Amino acid sequence: MSRLVYVIFLLVVVEGSRNTLERNTETNATEAKVEGKGTIKLPPNVTIPGIITFGDSIVDSGNNNHLRTALKCNFPPYGKDFPGKIATGRFSDGRVPSDIVAERLGIAETIPAYLNPKLKNEDLLKGVNFASGGSGYDPLTAKLVKVVSLSDQLKNFQEYKNKLKVIVGEEKANFLVKNSLYLVVASSNDIAHTYTARSIKYNKTSYADYLADSASKFVSALYGLGARRIGVFSAVPVGCVPAARTLRGKLKRRCSEKLNEVARNFNAKISPTLEALGKELPDSRVVLIDVCDTLNDMIENPKNYGFEVSNRGCCGTGLVEVLFLCNKINPFTCKNSSSYIFWDSYHPTEKAYQIIVDKLLGNYITKLV
């Protein structure tokens, strides 16, 4: 089968199954528990005991495995570069940003998914991951694909706090909750998917305002539950991910300026909003982590970062494959994912994540502690 015929076939499958396909495959594979060595030196007398993560598929470490949703990736070739080559449910070839941050801070090599029923008590003591692929700041985003909304992720966090108190006592539990680093990664699904469904009610500017307001309310609620060190990822150039180029960029597969404009509007709104919120909430460190400029530069200048390909993913043809379309029987998957910025048509490779984290963590960590 030629590459062109295969792509046409995949596009038909994507359109035909977008709102109807639902899977219920699960994996409870045990993740690697190797401790990270740490490459970021913290200021004297500063401790970050754990990493606690909320958001979407950029950081989901396997929570969707345990949901009745089509948005899963707990099968090969996902995870091919993960320790042990395990498809854990991370939407990448390897680890995701929250794992890499934890390693760089010397906490652990990976941060587990909270919904994994095989978690042991000791797994909870270095932080957990509540993120659910397909979620977003807009409540409709998670509802459309039957995943864990951000509001329900907060409920899971409250449950987690109660478990900590039982395991280590109230004093140690409060210390972990207060001093852990919180990562919030959302907005991509809102912009790439839900914005179209909301376009009757919102334009590009008003929808960005709505998302920024929702993000601010989420951070305030997280603070109310005890979080103090909160890093919020900016929106990324959603219009430049391979799938957006294929579905919206016409024959030349250019970036979707419409989607990128919504992302820029959101970033312009959320930046002063979070800055004001940080001043309003006592003893808080609320910081916007600007991922957009770094990823955009990587996409425009891939060779400067050691990549060869930035407009296609490694999996399959790299044009539309994601989730079940990115599978081990796809004949076009690349052999060397480290040459690609994107693993599938939406999500970066671990190598790309490592570059982003290493470029940004050193700049932002002092603001967060």
From Swiss-Prot:
Glycans are attached at N28, N45, N203, N336. Keywords: Glycoprotein, Hydrolase, Lipid degradation, Lipid metabolism, Secreted, Signal. Its main location: secreted. GO terms for cellular component: extracellular region. GO terms for molecular function: hydrolase activity, acting on ester bonds. It is found in: Secreted. The active site is at S57, D344, H347. The keyword Repressor does not apply. Belongs to the 'GDSL' lipolytic enzyme family. This is GDSL esterase/lipase At5g42170.
